[in-house]
Amino acid sequence: MNNNGMQMPQARYVLPSFIEQSAYGTKETNPYAKLFEERIIFLGTQVDDTSANDIMAQLLVLEGLDPDRDITMYINSPGGSFTSLMAIYDTMQYVRPDVRTVCLGQAASAAAVLLAAGAPGKRACLPNSRVLIHQPATQGTQGQVSDLEIQAKEIERMRTLMEQTLARHTGRSAEQVRIDTDRDKILTAEEAVEYGIVDQVFDYRKLNG
């Protein structure tokens, strides 16, 4: 966790910290804290309750600091919980700043919906990004017949909501999204633009230097 109690994306190496000097003295910081100072949120883990709470808190804090400046969310995530996805999604739509979304690596399942939910014209992929969309995953269900019926209705509700959400942000019909997500649909960066999940593929900064 960082100094604010937020969980940082897990790394297979030691996360470096460094000393930063300013007119007010010195302080120890780390890459994720520096990104936050630049109004950048990094989703680099599975979408679950913990990561959702962290991201929602950062969105709300950044809105309070400056409601008129964009927030950028970088995404490299295999997806995860549908309820956690919708919690982040609602917060992205709720806050006043535009939320830019950028995929680097992959945006799969729930993370693909978050990628598409960025502000119109402000959604992008890096060239070798991978985007995967499919219907919400469900765990094995058990219980009484009446409970199974309730669970089946909830599964269908979640699927319909996800389809409507993707349709809203891609310009596709909900019916087309249902067909496309019946099985895994894997998109390259260029295909994600064609589908309407993002608006552009970023060039490497070195090429523009």
Swiss-Prot record:
Name of the protein this chain belongs to: ATP-dependent Clp protease proteolytic subunit 1
This protein's UniProt keywords: Cytoplasm, Hydrolase, Protease, Serine protease
Keyword Chaperone: no
Active site, per annotation: S109 (nucleophile), H134
GO terms for MF: ATP-dependent peptidase activity; ATPase binding; serine-type endopeptidase activity
EC primary class: hydrolase
PROSITE patterns: CLP_PROTEASE_HIS, CLP_PROTEASE_SER
Subunit-level organization: Fourteen ClpP subunits assemble into 2 heptameric rings which stack back to back to give a disk-like structure with a central cavity, resembling the structure of eukaryotic proteasomes.
Family classification: Belongs to the peptidase S14 family.
Catalytic activity: Hydrolysis of proteins to small peptides in the presence of ATP and magnesium. alpha-casein is the usual test substrate. In the absence of ATP, only oligopeptides shorter than five residues are hydrolyzed (such as succinyl-Leu-Tyr-|-NHMec, and Leu-Tyr-Leu-|-Tyr-Trp, in which cleavage of the -Tyr-|-Leu- and -Tyr-|-Trp bonds also occurs)
GO annotation (BP), single: protein quality control for misfolded or incompletely synthesized proteins
GO cellular component: cytoplasm; endopeptidase Clp complex
Family matches, as InterPro entries: ClpP (IPR001907), ClpP/crotonase-like_dom_sf (IPR029045), ClpP/TepA (IPR023562), ClpP_His_AS (IPR033135), ClpP_Ser_AS (IPR018215)
Compartments, as annotated in UniProt: Cytoplasm
Pfam families documented for this protein: CLP_protease (PF00574)
Record function comment: Cleaves peptides in various proteins in a process that requires ATP hydrolysis. Has a chymotrypsin-like activity. Plays a major role in the degradation of misfolded proteins.
